[in-house]
């Protein structure tokens, strides 16, 4: 291999070219590569954060949905209990009213029965006096024998 001036000149030119590239071309290229690398890394980080945020939002939405369902179920259960309570209260009121009406009817029946017994006693007494008049053939004084009729009616 022959080393001559051309090879030395080419080596010097190449060295100057490399130094020139290292001084003026390489820093902007490195800077551009670093900026691009940073943008890509930031984009990936943003995508990861967005994915995590989406996952958290979905989890939170699911939790809120479960809570809403639980609240709805609780409200429905409370409504059912309240409805059952209202039905039971209505039944109790109906029973009380029925008992009151029944007691009132029994009292009226008892009163009518007593009135009928008193009327029957009076009629029996009048019939007894009428029968006694017919048997004795004479008129019995109603005022004089009222006590006798009352005793007879009380015995019947």
Curated annotation (Swiss-Prot):
Coiled-coil residues: none
Give the bilayer topology. Single-pass membrane protein
Q: Which family does it belong to?
A: Belongs to the ATPase B chain family.
Q: Where in the cell is it found?
A: Cell inner membrane
Q: How does it assemble?
A: F-type ATPases have 2 components, F(1) - the catalytic core - and F(0) - the membrane proton channel. F(1) has five subunits: alpha(3), beta(3), gamma(1), delta(1), epsilon(1). F(0) has three main subunits: a(1), b(2) and c(10-14). The alpha and beta chains form an alternating ring which encloses part of the gamma chain. F(1) is attached to F(0) by a central stalk formed by the gamma and epsilon chains, while a peripheral stalk is formed by the delta and b chains.
Q: What does this protein do?
A: F(1)F(0) ATP synthase produces ATP from ADP in the presence of a proton or sodium gradient. F-type ATPases consist of two structural domains, F(1) containing the extramembraneous catalytic core and F(0) containing the membrane proton channel, linked together by a central stalk and a peripheral stalk. During catalysis, ATP synthesis in the catalytic domain of F(1) is coupled via a rotary mechanism of the central stalk subunits to proton translocation. Component of the F(0) channel, it forms part of the peripheral stalk, linking F(1) to F(0).
Q: Which residues cross the membrane?
A: 12-32
> Per its record, what are the GO molecular function terms?
proton-transporting ATP synthase activity, rotational mechanism; proton-transporting ATPase activity, rotational mechanism
Q: What is this protein called?
A: ATP synthase subunit b
Q: Name one GO cellular component term.
A: proton-transporting ATP synthase complex
**Highest taxon, organism lineage:** Bacteria
User: In the UniProt record, what gene is named as encoding this protein?
Assistant: atpF
Pfam families per UniProt: ATP-synt_B (PF00430)
Q: What is its main location?
A: membrane
| UniProtKB keywords | ATP synthesis, Cell inner membrane, Cell membrane, CF(0), Hydrogen ion transport, Ion transport, Membrane, Transmembrane, Transmembrane helix, Transport
């Amino acid at each position: 291999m022959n080393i001559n001036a051309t090879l030395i000149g080419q080596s010097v030119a190449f060295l100057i070219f490399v130094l020139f590239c290292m001084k003026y071309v390489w820093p902007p290229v490195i800077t551009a590569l670093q900026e691009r690398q940073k943008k890509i890394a930031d984009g990936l980080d943003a995508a990861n954060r967005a994915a995590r945020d989406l996952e958290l939002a979905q989890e939170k939405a699911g939790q809120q949905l479960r809570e809403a369902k639980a609240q709805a179920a609780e409200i429905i259960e409370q409504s059912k209990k309240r409805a059952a309570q209202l039905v039971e209260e209505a039944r109790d009121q109906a029973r009380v009213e029925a008992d009151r009406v029944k007691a009132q009817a029994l009292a009226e029946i008892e009163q009518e029965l007593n009135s009928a017994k008193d009327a029957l006693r009076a009629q029996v007494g009048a019939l007894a006096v009428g029968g006694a008049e017919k048997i004795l053939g004479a008129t019995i004084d109603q005022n004089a024998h009222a006590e006798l009729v009352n005793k007879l009616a009380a015995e019947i």
